[in-house]
Amino acid sequence: MNVSTYNIRPIYRSHRLIRSRSCFCILNPLAVRFYSSKNFSSSNNPIANSNEKSSHHDEKLREIIETTNFGSELRKKKEMHDKKLHEQKAYEKYEKEAEGKETPQEKGQEEDSVSNSDKSTPEEEVKANDGSIIASEISEDIQREIGNLPSQKETRRYQLSKKLEEYLDSLQDTIFTATRALNDVTGYSSIEQLKKSINDLEVQLKNEKDNVKKCKDLYSQAILRRSLSQREINELLTRKHNWSPDDLERFTTLYRNDHVNEQEESNTHNALNDAESKVDAIQLKLTQSILTRYHEEQIWSDKIRRASTWGTWILMGINLFLFILATFLVEPWKRKRLVGSFEDKVKQAIFEMSEVQEGKWDQMILQQKESAAQQSVSTLKSWWFNSDDDSEPNKSSVYPMILTPVDNSWQGLKTTIRSHYNALRSSTISTLQFEKYEFAWFATTITILGCALGSILTVYFK
Protein backbone atom coordinates (compact mmCIF):
# COMPACT_ATOMS: atom_id res chain seq x y z
CA MET A 1 0.00 0.00 0.00
CA ASN A 2 1.56 3.30 -1.10
CA VAL A 3 1.25 6.68 0.57
CA SER A 4 -1.47 8.04 -1.65
CA THR A 5 -3.87 5.10 -1.30
CA TYR A 6 -3.32 5.06 2.44
CA ASN A 7 -4.08 8.75 2.93
CA ILE A 8 -6.82 9.42 0.38
CA ARG A 9 -9.78 8.57 2.65
CA PRO A 10 -8.63 10.79 5.57
CA ILE A 11 -8.00 13.60 3.07
CA TYR A 12 -11.49 13.35 1.64
CA ARG A 13 -12.99 13.26 5.13
CA SER A 14 -10.89 16.29 6.18
CA HIS A 15 -12.03 18.20 3.06
CA ARG A 16 -15.65 17.47 3.84
CA LEU A 17 -15.25 18.61 7.44
CA ILE A 18 -13.46 21.80 6.40
CA ARG A 19 -16.05 22.64 3.74
CA SER A 20 -18.92 22.03 6.17
CA ARG A 21 -17.32 23.93 9.06
CA SER A 22 -15.36 26.88 7.79
CA CYS A 23 -14.60 28.16 11.31
CA PHE A 24 -13.72 24.78 12.88
CA CYS A 25 -10.87 22.91 11.13
CA ILE A 26 -10.23 19.21 11.73
CA LEU A 27 -7.02 17.85 10.23
CA ASN A 28 -5.79 14.32 10.10
CA PRO A 29 -2.03 13.96 10.63
CA LEU A 30 -1.87 11.56 7.69
CA ALA A 31 -3.63 14.11 5.51
CA VAL A 32 -1.20 16.82 6.56
CA ARG A 33 1.72 14.57 5.70
CA PHE A 34 0.05 13.94 2.38
CA TYR A 35 -0.25 17.69 1.71
CA SER A 36 3.33 18.42 2.72
CA SER A 37 4.93 15.51 0.83
CA LYS A 38 6.87 16.53 -2.29
CA ASN A 39 7.76 12.97 -3.27
CA PHE A 40 4.20 12.16 -4.25
CA SER A 41 3.97 11.75 -8.00
CA SER A 42 0.59 12.30 -9.55
CA SER A 43 1.69 10.81 -12.86
CA ASN A 44 2.41 7.40 -11.29
CA ASN A 45 -0.81 7.22 -9.29
CA PRO A 46 -4.26 7.28 -10.91
CA ILE A 47 -5.90 8.23 -7.62
CA ALA A 48 -3.63 11.26 -7.37
CA ASN A 49 -4.65 12.28 -10.90
CA SER A 50 -8.26 12.19 -9.77
CA ASN A 51 -7.37 14.47 -6.84
CA GLU A 52 -5.67 17.21 -8.89
CA LYS A 53 -8.99 19.06 -8.93
CA SER A 54 -8.78 19.51 -5.17
CA SER A 55 -5.57 21.58 -5.29
CA HIS A 56 -7.56 24.77 -4.69
CA HIS A 57 -8.87 23.11 -1.51
CA ASP A 58 -5.25 22.77 -0.33
CA GLU A 59 -4.69 26.48 -0.83
CA LYS A 60 -7.98 27.27 0.92
CA LEU A 61 -7.07 24.96 3.79
CA ARG A 62 -3.67 26.63 4.12
CA GLU A 63 -5.28 30.07 4.13
CA ILE A 64 -7.76 29.02 6.85
CA ILE A 65 -4.96 27.64 8.99
CA GLU A 66 -2.76 30.70 8.52
CA THR A 67 -5.60 33.04 9.54
CA THR A 68 -5.90 31.30 12.92
CA ASN A 69 -3.63 31.71 15.95
CA PHE A 70 -1.90 28.48 15.06
CA GLY A 71 -1.00 29.85 11.63
CA SER A 72 0.47 33.07 13.05
CA GLU A 73 2.53 31.15 15.57
CA LEU A 74 3.75 28.78 12.89
CA ARG A 75 4.69 31.66 10.61
CA LYS A 76 6.76 33.16 13.41
CA LYS A 77 8.45 29.81 14.01
CA LYS A 78 9.09 29.40 10.29
CA GLU A 79 10.58 32.89 9.99
CA MET A 80 12.86 32.27 12.96
CA HIS A 81 13.95 28.94 11.49
CA ASP A 82 14.67 30.46 8.05
CA LYS A 83 16.57 33.32 9.67
CA LYS A 84 18.76 30.91 11.61
CA LEU A 85 19.46 28.88 8.46
CA HIS A 86 20.43 31.99 6.47
CA GLU A 87 22.67 33.22 9.28
CA GLN A 88 24.36 29.82 9.48
CA LYS A 89 24.92 29.70 5.71
CA ALA A 90 26.28 33.26 5.68
CA TYR A 91 28.64 32.46 8.55
CA GLU A 92 29.95 29.35 6.77
CA LYS A 93 30.40 31.32 3.57
CA TYR A 94 32.28 34.04 5.43
CA GLU A 95 34.61 31.45 6.95
CA LYS A 96 35.36 29.92 3.56
CA GLU A 97 36.05 33.34 2.03
CA ALA A 98 38.37 34.14 4.92
CA GLU A 99 40.30 30.95 4.34
CA GLY A 100 40.67 31.74 0.61
CA LYS A 101 40.01 28.20 -0.52
CA GLU A 102 36.95 28.91 -2.57
CA THR A 103 36.97 29.21 -6.38
CA PRO A 104 34.36 31.04 -8.50
CA GLN A 105 33.02 27.74 -9.76
CA GLU A 106 32.66 26.44 -6.24
CA LYS A 107 30.99 29.69 -5.28
CA GLY A 108 28.47 29.27 -8.09
CA GLN A 109 27.83 25.66 -7.18
CA GLU A 110 27.48 26.57 -3.53
CA GLU A 111 25.07 29.39 -4.31
CA ASP A 112 23.01 27.08 -6.50
CA SER A 113 23.01 24.37 -3.87
CA VAL A 114 22.16 26.87 -1.15
CA SER A 115 19.32 28.32 -3.19
CA ASN A 116 18.02 24.88 -4.12
CA SER A 117 18.32 23.65 -0.57
CA ASP A 118 16.64 26.82 0.69
CA LYS A 119 13.87 26.27 -1.77
CA SER A 120 13.40 22.54 -1.34
CA THR A 121 14.71 20.92 1.82
CA PRO A 122 13.97 23.53 4.51
CA GLU A 123 10.58 24.27 3.04
CA GLU A 124 9.68 20.59 2.99
CA GLU A 125 10.93 20.05 6.52
CA VAL A 126 9.19 23.16 7.80
CA LYS A 127 5.96 22.24 6.06
CA ALA A 128 6.09 18.70 7.40
CA ASN A 129 6.85 19.94 10.91
CA ASP A 130 4.18 22.64 10.61
CA GLY A 131 1.63 20.09 9.49
CA SER A 132 2.38 17.69 12.33
CA ILE A 133 2.38 20.52 14.90
CA ILE A 134 -0.89 21.91 13.55
CA ALA A 135 -2.49 18.48 13.59
CA SER A 136 -1.41 17.75 17.15
CA GLU A 137 -2.44 21.19 18.43
CA ILE A 138 -5.82 21.06 16.72
CA SER A 139 -6.39 17.54 18.04
CA GLU A 140 -5.59 18.71 21.59
CA ASP A 141 -7.86 21.73 21.14
CA ILE A 142 -10.71 19.49 19.97
CA GLN A 143 -10.24 17.16 22.92
CA ARG A 144 -10.28 20.09 25.37
CA GLU A 145 -13.40 21.62 23.82
CA ILE A 146 -15.46 18.45 23.45
CA GLY A 147 -14.17 16.32 26.34
CA ASN A 148 -15.13 12.79 27.43
CA LEU A 149 -13.89 11.29 24.17
CA PRO A 150 -13.22 7.53 24.06
CA SER A 151 -9.50 8.14 23.65
CA GLN A 152 -9.46 10.38 26.74
CA LYS A 153 -11.44 7.83 28.74
CA GLU A 154 -9.09 5.07 27.60
CA THR A 155 -6.06 7.18 28.54
CA ARG A 156 -7.48 7.91 32.00
CA ARG A 157 -8.40 4.26 32.46
CA TYR A 158 -4.90 3.18 31.45
CA GLN A 159 -3.29 5.69 33.82
CA LEU A 160 -5.59 4.62 36.64
CA SER A 161 -4.88 0.93 36.06
CA LYS A 162 -1.16 1.64 35.91
CA LYS A 163 -1.26 3.56 39.21
CA LEU A 164 -3.34 0.80 40.79
CA GLU A 165 -0.89 -1.83 39.59
CA GLU A 166 2.06 0.12 40.98
CA TYR A 167 0.23 0.58 44.28
CA LEU A 168 -0.55 -3.15 44.52
CA ASP A 169 3.07 -4.03 43.72
CA SER A 170 4.35 -1.68 46.40
CA LEU A 171 1.75 -3.01 48.84
CA GLN A 172 2.81 -6.58 48.10
CA ASP A 173 6.47 -5.69 48.64
CA THR A 174 5.59 -3.97 51.90
CA ILE A 175 3.58 -6.96 53.13
CA PHE A 176 6.39 -9.33 52.17
CA THR A 177 8.98 -7.20 53.98
CA ALA A 178 6.79 -6.93 57.08
CA THR A 179 6.16 -10.70 57.08
CA ARG A 180 9.86 -11.44 56.75
CA ALA A 181 10.70 -9.02 59.57
CA LEU A 182 8.04 -10.62 61.77
CA ASN A 183 9.43 -14.09 61.02
CA ASP A 184 12.94 -12.89 61.88
CA VAL A 185 11.73 -11.48 65.19
CA THR A 186 9.72 -14.55 66.17
CA GLY A 187 12.40 -17.00 64.97
CA TYR A 188 10.30 -18.66 62.27
CA SER A 189 12.89 -17.89 59.56
CA SER A 190 15.18 -20.63 60.92
CA ILE A 191 12.23 -23.03 60.85
CA GLU A 192 11.67 -22.08 57.22
CA GLN A 193 15.32 -22.86 56.48
CA LEU A 194 14.91 -26.19 58.26
CA LYS A 195 11.84 -26.97 56.16
CA LYS A 196 13.79 -26.10 53.03
CA SER A 197 16.64 -28.42 54.08
CA ILE A 198 14.06 -31.18 54.70
CA ASN A 199 12.72 -30.72 51.18
CA ASP A 200 16.28 -30.92 49.82
CA LEU A 201 16.89 -34.09 51.84
CA GLU A 202 13.71 -35.62 50.47
CA VAL A 203 14.86 -34.93 46.92
CA GLN A 204 18.32 -36.29 47.73
CA LEU A 205 16.80 -39.41 49.33
CA LYS A 206 14.70 -40.00 46.24
CA ASN A 207 17.78 -39.73 44.01
CA GLU A 208 19.78 -42.07 46.24
CA LYS A 209 16.97 -44.62 46.22
CA ASP A 210 16.98 -44.50 42.43
CA ASN A 211 20.74 -45.02 42.58
CA VAL A 212 20.24 -48.04 44.88
CA LYS A 213 17.82 -49.52 42.37
CA LYS A 214 20.37 -49.06 39.60
CA CYS A 215 23.10 -50.62 41.73
CA LYS A 216 20.85 -53.57 42.52
CA ASP A 217 20.15 -54.06 38.85
CA LEU A 218 23.88 -53.94 38.04
CA TYR A 219 24.68 -56.34 40.89
CA SER A 220 21.98 -58.78 39.80
CA GLN A 221 23.24 -58.58 36.21
CA ALA A 222 26.82 -59.25 37.38
CA ILE A 223 25.66 -62.27 39.43
CA LEU A 224 23.68 -63.56 36.47
CA ARG A 225 26.64 -63.22 34.11
CA ARG A 226 28.99 -65.03 36.52
CA SER A 227 26.47 -67.80 37.20
CA LEU A 228 25.96 -68.33 33.49
CA SER A 229 29.72 -68.37 32.94
CA GLN A 230 30.24 -70.91 35.74
CA ARG A 231 27.40 -73.08 34.46
CA GLU A 232 28.94 -73.12 31.02
CA ILE A 233 32.34 -73.95 32.51
CA ASN A 234 30.83 -76.85 34.45
CA GLU A 235 29.15 -78.15 31.31
CA LEU A 236 32.45 -78.03 29.47
CA LEU A 237 34.22 -79.83 32.33
CA THR A 238 31.66 -82.64 32.29
CA ARG A 239 32.62 -83.47 28.69
CA LYS A 240 36.28 -82.70 29.04
CA HIS A 241 37.38 -85.85 27.23
CA ASN A 242 35.37 -84.86 24.14
CA TRP A 243 36.65 -81.27 23.80
CA SER A 244 37.20 -79.85 20.42
CA PRO A 245 39.54 -76.96 19.70
CA ASP A 246 36.61 -74.59 19.87
CA ASP A 247 35.59 -75.99 23.25
CA LEU A 248 39.12 -75.53 24.52
CA GLU A 249 39.23 -71.97 23.31
CA ARG A 250 35.80 -71.33 24.81
CA PHE A 251 36.87 -72.78 28.18
CA THR A 252 39.96 -70.62 28.20
CA THR A 253 37.90 -67.51 27.44
CA LEU A 254 35.33 -68.34 30.09
CA TYR A 255 37.97 -69.07 32.69
CA ARG A 256 39.72 -65.81 31.88
CA ASN A 257 36.44 -63.84 32.08
CA ASP A 258 35.46 -65.48 35.35
CA HIS A 259 37.96 -63.34 37.23
CA VAL A 260 36.60 -60.23 35.53
CA ASN A 261 33.04 -61.20 36.40
CA GLU A 262 34.08 -61.80 39.98
CA GLN A 263 35.66 -58.34 40.19
CA GLU A 264 32.60 -56.78 38.59
CA GLU A 265 30.33 -58.59 41.03
CA SER A 266 32.44 -57.43 43.95
CA ASN A 267 32.47 -53.82 42.69
CA THR A 268 28.73 -53.73 42.12
CA HIS A 269 28.20 -55.27 45.55
CA ASN A 270 30.38 -52.60 47.17
CA ALA A 271 28.59 -49.87 45.19
CA LEU A 272 25.25 -51.28 46.32
CA ASN A 273 26.41 -51.32 49.93
CA ASP A 274 27.65 -47.72 49.64
CA ALA A 275 24.37 -46.59 48.08
CA GLU A 276 22.36 -48.35 50.77
CA SER A 277 24.51 -46.81 53.49
CA LYS A 278 23.98 -43.37 51.92
CA VAL A 279 20.24 -43.99 51.81
CA ASP A 280 20.28 -45.04 55.45
CA ALA A 281 22.32 -41.97 56.42
CA ILE A 282 20.04 -39.61 54.47
CA GLN A 283 16.98 -41.35 55.88
CA LEU A 284 18.32 -40.98 59.39
CA LYS A 285 19.21 -37.33 58.80
CA LEU A 286 15.79 -36.70 57.27
CA THR A 287 14.04 -38.32 60.23
CA GLN A 288 16.13 -36.32 62.66
CA SER A 289 15.45 -33.11 60.73
CA ILE A 290 11.71 -33.80 60.75
CA LEU A 291 11.79 -34.43 64.49
CA THR A 292 13.81 -31.26 65.00
CA ARG A 293 11.36 -29.33 62.85
CA TYR A 294 8.36 -30.57 64.79
CA HIS A 295 10.14 -29.84 68.06
CA GLU A 296 11.09 -26.31 66.98
CA GLU A 297 7.62 -25.66 65.64
CA GLN A 298 6.16 -26.83 68.94
CA ILE A 299 8.47 -24.48 70.83
CA TRP A 300 7.62 -21.64 68.44
CA SER A 301 3.88 -22.29 68.75
CA ASP A 302 4.20 -22.40 72.55
CA LYS A 303 6.06 -19.10 72.48
CA ILE A 304 3.47 -17.52 70.20
CA ARG A 305 0.66 -18.92 72.35
CA ARG A 306 2.33 -17.58 75.47
CA ALA A 307 2.87 -14.20 73.83
CA SER A 308 -0.74 -14.14 72.65
CA THR A 309 -1.90 -15.01 76.18
CA TRP A 310 0.16 -12.21 77.69
CA GLY A 311 -1.02 -9.89 74.96
CA THR A 312 -4.63 -10.80 75.72
CA TRP A 313 -4.09 -10.14 79.43
CA ILE A 314 -2.39 -6.84 78.68
CA LEU A 315 -5.23 -5.78 76.40
CA MET A 316 -7.75 -6.78 79.06
CA GLY A 317 -5.82 -4.77 81.64
CA ILE A 318 -5.68 -1.76 79.35
CA ASN A 319 -9.40 -2.04 78.68
CA LEU A 320 -10.12 -2.38 82.40
CA PHE A 321 -7.91 0.61 83.18
CA LEU A 322 -9.61 2.69 80.50
CA PHE A 323 -13.02 1.61 81.79
CA ILE A 324 -12.13 2.59 85.37
CA LEU A 325 -10.58 5.83 84.19
CA ALA A 326 -13.61 6.69 82.08
CA THR A 327 -16.11 5.66 84.77
CA PHE A 328 -14.56 7.22 87.87
CA LEU A 329 -12.59 10.14 86.47
CA VAL A 330 -13.54 11.19 82.99
CA GLU A 331 -17.31 10.85 83.26
CA PRO A 332 -17.59 12.70 86.62
CA TRP A 333 -15.29 15.40 85.34
CA LYS A 334 -17.35 15.73 82.17
CA ARG A 335 -20.58 15.72 84.17
CA LYS A 336 -19.23 18.30 86.59
CA ARG A 337 -17.98 20.44 83.78
CA LEU A 338 -21.30 20.14 81.96
CA VAL A 339 -23.29 20.96 85.11
CA GLY A 340 -20.95 23.85 85.94
CA SER A 341 -21.25 25.28 82.48
CA PHE A 342 -25.03 24.83 82.64
CA GLU A 343 -25.19 26.49 86.06
CA ASP A 344 -23.02 29.33 84.85
CA LYS A 345 -25.28 29.83 81.88
CA VAL A 346 -28.39 29.69 84.09
CA LYS A 347 -26.86 32.12 86.57
CA GLN A 348 -25.84 34.43 83.80
CA ALA A 349 -29.34 34.29 82.32
CA ILE A 350 -30.95 34.85 85.74
CA PHE A 351 -28.56 37.69 86.50
CA GLU A 352 -29.30 39.34 83.18
CA MET A 353 -33.02 38.84 83.71
CA SER A 354 -32.80 40.19 87.28
CA GLU A 355 -30.90 43.22 86.07
CA VAL A 356 -33.59 43.85 83.52
CA GLN A 357 -36.36 43.33 86.10
CA GLU A 358 -34.57 45.47 88.70
CA GLY A 359 -34.23 48.22 86.20
CA LYS A 360 -37.91 47.99 85.44
CA TRP A 361 -38.84 47.82 89.16
CA ASP A 362 -36.58 50.76 90.01
CA GLN A 363 -38.11 52.73 87.22
CA MET A 364 -41.63 51.84 88.38
CA ILE A 365 -40.83 52.65 92.05
CA LEU A 366 -39.22 55.91 91.06
CA GLN A 367 -42.25 56.81 89.01
CA GLN A 368 -44.56 55.90 91.92
CA LYS A 369 -42.47 57.93 94.34
CA GLU A 370 -42.46 60.90 92.03
CA SER A 371 -46.20 60.66 91.51
CA ALA A 372 -46.83 60.23 95.28
CA ALA A 373 -44.51 63.14 96.09
CA GLN A 374 -46.21 65.33 93.56
CA GLN A 375 -49.61 64.31 94.92
CA SER A 376 -48.57 64.93 98.54
CA VAL A 377 -47.03 68.28 97.67
CA SER A 378 -50.16 69.34 95.88
CA THR A 379 -52.30 68.13 98.82
CA LEU A 380 -50.13 69.87 101.39
CA LYS A 381 -50.19 73.10 99.43
CA SER A 382 -53.92 72.94 99.07
CA TRP A 383 -54.37 72.27 102.81
CA TRP A 384 -51.92 74.94 103.77
CA PHE A 385 -53.54 77.61 101.66
CA ASN A 386 -57.04 76.57 102.80
CA SER A 387 -56.15 76.46 106.54
CA ASP A 388 -56.33 80.26 106.96
CA ASP A 389 -59.93 80.29 105.82
CA ASP A 390 -60.77 77.48 108.26
CA SER A 391 -61.67 75.35 105.34
CA GLU A 392 -61.09 71.59 105.35
CA PRO A 393 -58.79 69.81 103.00
CA ASN A 394 -59.89 68.19 99.85
CA LYS A 395 -62.40 65.64 100.81
CA SER A 396 -60.59 62.36 100.64
CA SER A 397 -60.82 59.28 102.80
CA VAL A 398 -57.09 58.38 102.35
CA TYR A 399 -54.25 60.66 103.36
CA PRO A 400 -50.64 59.85 102.41
CA MET A 401 -48.44 60.38 105.45
CA ILE A 402 -45.03 61.65 104.34
CA LEU A 403 -42.75 62.27 107.30
CA THR A 404 -39.92 63.81 105.31
CA PRO A 405 -40.29 67.55 104.75
CA VAL A 406 -41.12 68.90 101.36
CA ASP A 407 -37.83 70.76 101.17
CA ASN A 408 -34.86 70.77 103.48
CA SER A 409 -35.72 73.96 105.35
CA TRP A 410 -37.43 75.05 108.52
CA GLN A 411 -40.38 76.40 106.61
CA GLY A 412 -40.79 73.07 104.84
CA LEU A 413 -40.71 71.23 108.18
CA LYS A 414 -43.35 73.53 109.64
CA THR A 415 -45.47 73.07 106.52
CA THR A 416 -45.24 69.28 106.79
CA ILE A 417 -46.15 69.26 110.51
CA ARG A 418 -49.03 71.62 109.99
CA SER A 419 -50.41 69.55 107.07
CA HIS A 420 -50.23 66.37 109.17
CA TYR A 421 -51.96 68.14 112.04
CA ASN A 422 -54.76 69.34 109.78
CA ALA A 423 -55.10 65.81 108.39
CA LEU A 424 -55.46 64.38 111.88
CA ARG A 425 -58.05 67.02 112.77
CA SER A 426 -59.98 66.49 109.55
CA SER A 427 -63.17 64.47 109.87
CA THR A 428 -63.19 63.35 106.24
CA ILE A 429 -59.90 61.42 106.43
CA SER A 430 -60.38 57.96 107.75
CA THR A 431 -57.15 56.29 106.55
CA LEU A 432 -53.52 57.32 106.84
CA GLN A 433 -51.27 55.78 104.12
CA PHE A 434 -47.64 55.15 105.03
CA GLU A 435 -44.89 53.88 102.77
CA LYS A 436 -42.85 50.99 104.02
CA TYR A 437 -39.75 53.05 104.60
CA GLU A 438 -41.72 55.90 106.17
CA PHE A 439 -43.60 53.54 108.47
CA ALA A 440 -40.38 51.86 109.62
CA TRP A 441 -38.85 55.22 110.34
CA PHE A 442 -42.00 56.36 112.17
CA ALA A 443 -42.25 53.16 114.24
CA THR A 444 -38.57 53.33 115.16
CA THR A 445 -38.89 56.95 116.23
CA ILE A 446 -42.00 56.27 118.36
CA THR A 447 -40.30 53.24 119.94
CA ILE A 448 -37.20 55.22 120.83
CA LEU A 449 -39.26 58.11 122.22
CA GLY A 450 -41.44 55.69 124.23
CA CYS A 451 -38.40 53.92 125.68
CA ALA A 452 -36.77 57.23 126.56
CA LEU A 453 -39.94 58.57 128.15
CA GLY A 454 -40.48 55.34 130.09
CA SER A 455 -36.91 55.39 131.36
CA ILE A 456 -37.25 59.01 132.49
CA LEU A 457 -40.51 58.30 134.27
CA THR A 458 -39.06 55.21 135.94
CA VAL A 459 -36.05 57.14 137.18
CA TYR A 460 -38.20 60.05 138.31
CA PHE A 461 -40.81 58.05 140.25
CA LYS A 462 -38.43 55.55 141.75
Swiss-Prot record:
It is found in: Mitochondrion inner membrane. GO terms for biological process: inner mitochondrial membrane organization. One of its GO terms (cellular component) is mitochondrial inner membrane. Residues 93-110 have a biased composition (Basic and acidic residues). Residues 93-134 are annotated as: Disordered. This is Sensitive to high expression protein 9 homolog, mitochondrial. Homooligomer. It comes from the Eukaryota.
